[in-house]
């Protein structure tokens, strides 16, 4: 016979009693109660209807929640400008401008600059000359007003310490610079006004590597002359990416004459939204145009060595339109995992509806106490009694 300490049984009984008092050993089972409460019933059906409409109408159909998506396509952009223009200015005489002259850079990238106006300072050589009076701190009365070696943010060169005559009305500090300094006025009308009729060809290829799918915005045709005669139209020629510059600026909300005079920047956005469940038949580029800013210019120079052996340059201050091309896109295709996630989310929302209706019924309704007592019932097994003999 095995003996146990007297306190062991008492400790086990106390532990079991504690577990019972905490409800740890209680078993709960659901009890369904049919309640005739119109307010809660109507609220439940309306919420369920809202969830179903949201899941089916918005999440599944509108947002295509049944599709796996690729939001990071690989893109390639090639641009070509076509057109010629003639300018008549004293410094350059009659000059013909073609693509190599008015497009910067000439490689045809997604950011390029179209020259529409310019200011030329020809035959500059390095030496001493008076600063332009419009430059801050350039005007002077004596040599003391021109500290030697001083230069400013807007200065064309370094001061030599001399105050010299600029013209009949101004005296300015002499500088070491490319001389003569730039001093002309911007033409009142754009010198390359014909740029309005230039054409821009934009070839864009987009690749969705997740689905191994590629598409180009240019029509695949055996007719080599097609792109020489067509112009883009969203209805009749959606795959002819040839744009007239004047039309493009107008679609961006700008005026070509204003932008051509002092320059500006235009954004071109190409967006692809491809549904690959239809084999990409509706995968067409969507174009939009934005006027980003007014006023844009920069300077460039052509250098050569004169017959006298002196380095010489012609300085050009170019005004024009900067084009920025941005390509975005997304593609989707049916997949089981996103479909299951969307449907599962809807089922979770339906469960939340039941939870909210329970809160209304048990805590908010005027008969909440009655429904509480009806829904939650404590059941205990009957105690059995043994007759002692």
From Swiss-Prot:
Membrane topology, record value: Multi-pass membrane protein
Domain of life of the source: Eukaryota
A GO cellular component entry from the record: postsynaptic specialization membrane
Compartment list: Cell membrane; Endoplasmic reticulum; Nucleus; Nucleus inner membrane
Keywords assigned by UniProt, alphabetized: Cell membrane, Disulfide bond, Endoplasmic reticulum, Glycoprotein, Ion channel, Ion transport, Ligand-gated ion channel, Membrane, Nucleus, Receptor, Transmembrane, Transmembrane helix, Transport
Post-translational modification: N-glycosylated. N-linked glycosylation can affect trafficking to the membrane and function.
Catalytic activities: Ca(2+)(in) = Ca(2+)(out)
UniProt KW Aminoacyl-tRNA synthetase keyword: no
S-S pairs: 129-179, 140-163, 146-173, 230-240, 274-283
A biological-process GO annotation: response to ATP
GO molecular function annotations of the record: ATP binding; extracellularly ATP-gated monoatomic cation channel activity; protein-containing complex binding; purinergic nucleotide receptor activity
Record: glycosylation sites: 167, 197, 212
Cytoplasmic side: 1-45, 357-389
InterPro entries xref list: P2X6_purnocptor (IPR003049), P2X_extracellular_dom_sf (IPR027309), P2X_purnocptor (IPR001429), P2X_RECEPTOR_CS (IPR053792)
Membrane-spanning segments: 46-66, 336-356
Subunit structure, interactors included: Unlike most P2RXs, P2RX6 does not seem to form homotrimers. P2RX6 are likely to form as obligate heteromers with other P2RXs subunits. Forms heterotrimer with P2RX2 with a variable subunit stoichiometry determined by subunit expression levels. Forms heterotrimer with P2RX4; functional differences between homomeric P2RX4 and P2RX4/6 heterotrimer are minor. Forms a P2RX2/P2RX4/P2RX6 heterotrimer. Interacts with SF3A1; resulting in a reduction of the splicing activity.
Function as written in the Swiss-Prot or TrEMBL entry: Acts as a modulatory subunit rather than a functional channel. Unlike other P2XRs members, P2RX6 does not seem to form functional homotrimers. P2RX6 requires the presence of P2RX4 or P2RX2 to form functional heterotrimeric receptors at the plasma membrane. P2RX6 can be translocated to the nucleus, where it interacts with the splicing factor (SF3A1), to reduce the incidence of mRNA splicing. May function as a nuclear regulator of post-transcriptional modifications in neurons.
UniProt domain comment: An uncharged region within the N terminus of the P2RX6 subunit inhibits its assembly and exit from the endoplasmic reticulum. The P2RX6 subunit lacks nine residues in the left flipper, a flexible loop structure, which is a key element in the activation of P2RXs.
Record-given protein name: P2X purinoceptor 6
Species per Swiss-Prot/TrEMBL record: Mus musculus
Lineage of origin: Eukaryota, Metazoa, Chordata, Craniata, Vertebrata
